[in-house]
């Protein structure tokens, strides 16, 4: 029997930010960032649980990061997990989601060790998570057999869409523990998840702030970035791009932006093809990191 497995839940059909797992932060996809963080958590096997439509688009990323890719139901995520668990004999599941590139892997390791200790020395623990982490930096730990049992007992659409509630919304049947996170992880006011385009831009700023650090980033590094003025008060340059003015102002803004990791905003209404041609000359690596805010069509 496999002791632990990691399952990263991933879909590409988000209505607020479609295909967000495939968006780039630097030169890697959001999904790759998540998988590399979760690889720091010791486990017997590592899986991505996706839907059939997304499978072909993420399989290569999974392979590159030594994750097995499993396809199942799109809407019934609980069934997707159970179907995966029916293919592997394991005790403990560590669940993360593919829209959280700044996971606290240290907290994940501590929480799974606590979960396993409780199941050795106390009454059975079916589900455990640390509360108080930044929104987007935590994971869930649960018993594989308990989740299978829960799935067989609920028809609640919410339970089937979100997995964990099948356990913790039925505390009369399952022992679920929400442990207040240790002080070093306890920053509930911070946000690291990617749910909207604004979140995505913020994630880029976090990665830029930490560009001289080794990824996966430590919890201390992520917290420092999230609390920095660089991330919370980004500088957006708005160059004068009126037709006939030439490209001098835009060139100066580009120089400042590439030197200081500022953003540039050029509204779609600006009819300045010569300036857009200049933007096209920016080296691709700079463009990836700078993430110009430009509504060029």
Name these PLM-found stretches.
Residues 103-193, 198-208, 221-228:
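Conserved core of the sugar-phosphate nucleotidyltransferase
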Residues 47-51, 262-269:
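Short internal beta-strands
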Residues 30-45, 58-60, 255-260:
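A short, N-terminal amphipathic alpha-helix
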Residues 1-18, 236-239:
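N-terminal nucleotide-binding beta1-loop-alpha1 segment
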Residues 54-58, 269-275:
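Short, charged/polar "capping" segments at the starts of alpha-helices
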Residues 238, 267-273, 285-286:
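Active-site anion-handling motifs in enzyme catalytic cores
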């Amino acid at each position: 029997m496999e002791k632990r497995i990691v399952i990263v839940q991933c879909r590409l059909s988000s209505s607020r930010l479609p295909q967000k797992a495939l968006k780039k932060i630097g030169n890697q996809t959001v999904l790759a960032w998540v998988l590399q963080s979760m690889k720091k958590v010791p486990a017997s096997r590592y899986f991505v649980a996706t839907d059939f439509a997304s499978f072909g688009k993420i399989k290569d990323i999974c392979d590159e990061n030594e994750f097995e890719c499993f396809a199942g139901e799109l809407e019934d995520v609980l069934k997707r997990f159970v179907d995966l668990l029916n293919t592997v004999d394991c005790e403990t599941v560590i669940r993360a989601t593919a829209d959280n590139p700044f996971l606290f892997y240290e907290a994940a390791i501590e929480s799974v060790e606590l979960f396993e200790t409780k199941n050795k020395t106390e009454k059975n623990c079916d589900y455990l998570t640390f509360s108080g982490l930044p929104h987007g930096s935590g994971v869930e730990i649960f018993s594989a057999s308990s989740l299978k049992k829960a799935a067989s007992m609920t028809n609640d659409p919410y339970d089937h869409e979100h997995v964990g509630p099948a356990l913790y919304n039925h505390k009369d049947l399952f022992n679920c523990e929400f442990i207040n996170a240790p002080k070093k992880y306890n920053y509930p006011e911070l946000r690291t998840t990617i749910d909207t385009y604004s979140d995505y831009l913020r994630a880029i700023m976090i990665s830029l702030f930490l560009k001289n650090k080794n990824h996966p980033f430590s919890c201390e590094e992520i917290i420092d970035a999230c609390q920095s003025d660089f991330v919370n008060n980004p500088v957006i340059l708005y160059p004068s791009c009126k037709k006939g003015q030439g490209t001098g102002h835009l060139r100066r803004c580009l120089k400042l932006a590439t030197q200081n990791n500022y953003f540039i905003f050029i509204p779609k209404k600006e009819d300045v093809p010569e300036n857009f041609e200049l933007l096209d000359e920016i080296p691709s690596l700079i463009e990836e990191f700078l993430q110009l805010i430009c509504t060029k069509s």
